[in-house]
């Protein structure tokens, strides 16, 4: 996630030359270099959950999933999406891709504005991009925008499922938020536990009633 308070000017050539050896990742936006801030536990869990599902689903297929360390080049801009999938023939460049099919960003208070404005506008200019997935980490809210839907937003919440048409993968929101800790996840887990307890009690009552009915 870019730290907007820590940025400076640099040529595109110098940025590309220095980035591989830098201990801190940087995004590059029209001549300005922005240092990437560290990510929270929830951010890392969500990124890992999404990447894990994609990696399993795409194993043995042409499309390749990447997490966090592969840059996307759009004109004179370079971003590090949290997760991306590239289905184009591998060109051998290990620094960036220009042909992502799917991009995923995990949002936070410090990155939401960038992810929903600058990055959304930039990503929509990528001819190969079919879907952009934005995932909140502090609440449960999954936003999916598709090229085929005119980049209009669809939102999904706990209990919902949706399909990433670009890669043919159906995900549940609960899979995305597995082991994530926020108030929405906690409330949903409590509701699920209460429902399971109620169902078990109802089953026991039904079984007891059936046994009593069967007695002569």
Question: Which sequence ranges carry the predicted segments?
Answer:
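Gly/Pro/Ser/Thr-rich low-complexity, intrinsically disordered segments predominantly at protein N-termini
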Residues: 1-216
